[in-house]
Amino acid sequence: MNTAIADPSQVSEGRRLAVEFARKTGLDDAKLARIALVATEMATNLVKHGGGGTLVVDRFDDADGQGIELMALDRGAGMADVGSCLADGYSTAGSPGTGFGAITRQSDRLVIFSRPGLGTAVMARLIFGPAGKLPPRTALGAVSASYPGETVCGDHWAFAAGRTGRTLLVADGSGHGPEAARAALTAAQIFSDHVDDECVPLVDRLHRGLAPTRGAALAVARIDTTESIVRFVGIGNIAGTLVSDGDVRRMVSHNGIAGHVAPRIREFTYPFTGEPLVILHSDGLSTKWGLADYPGLAASHPSLIAGILFRDHRRGRDDATVVAVRPL
């Protein structure tokens, strides 16, 4: 769930949407009250300090455990000293200065990326259980948004840990709306059922399985930490990037539409050193971005990386999804 927060009148709506989203996960009233407080303070800060921005709410299941994640993304002046801004009583807007302190107290994890002139991204996580499906040493973050005016997103992503490594899928159903969403969700279901297949057979299975749908652009990236290699197979315009030890490589996809036209299904391999960061996104984001434009961002939490790329490079005329994953 994400919603624009542009003025004080939208703070209560942001809180309502955050609580509504979290309630669907079965959380009790005490947990919902914590989420409401964090959402309120984040939305208020977006208006007071960021000149407006976006509030993003999602579930998470990774190295931190399982719970609800809230992010506030703005293009405001940014902060030169994040540590000072976290303290109760610090304010630059004539307010009591309790917002970040309240967010810190209600959150189990709080991470901020901010630079003067580059805006601010704040991630707060409320942990309500241990990690589930994913291996415990994986950090994951994602942001998705539907085509303007649509109620469903035509993109879908999935991540799973199998015998052959940690594997990420991003699928962008052709067009937008319910039929695009059906194609992307079908891809995610096939992926989850066959995640232990080698990458080329897996993508071939996806291609055949999407034939009854309108098709999709899709990509699969498998991070093999035993061999220190990323295996990548893509059909269509899903962008893939590997970052490791300061080296940035754009991964190669072949043209086509999974389910209809896929003249070549080929795996490309990319060795890495250190802790790799893999980023996949649909064409709802421009590819004209570079992490070097955000000093220090590459080492930050994947949710903040996904959030900032979404904030600054979303085209605004299509469904958009960006996912970042880092084995720890």
Give the predicted meaning of each segment.
Residues N2-I5, D204-R214, T273-L328:
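C-terminal catalytic subdomain
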Residues R125-E179, A183-Q189, V261-P263, E267-T269:
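N-terminal entry segment of metal-dependent catalytic domains or homologous docking segments
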Residues E179-G246, V252, I265-R266, V325-P327:
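Catalytic core of PPM/PP2C metal-dependent serine/threonine phosphatase domains
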Residues T151-R163, L218, R250-L291:
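Acidic loop->beta-strand submotif enriched in PP2C/PPM serine/threonine phosphatases
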Residues M1-L37, G141-A160:
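Bergerat-fold GHKL ATPase/HATPase_c domain
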Residues M1, A43-K133, A161-L169, I223-T225, ...:
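Conserved beta-strand-loop-beta-strand hairpin that lines the nucleotide-binding pocket
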Residues V111, T120-G129, G141-Y147, I229, ...:
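Sensory/regulatory domains in signal-transduction proteins
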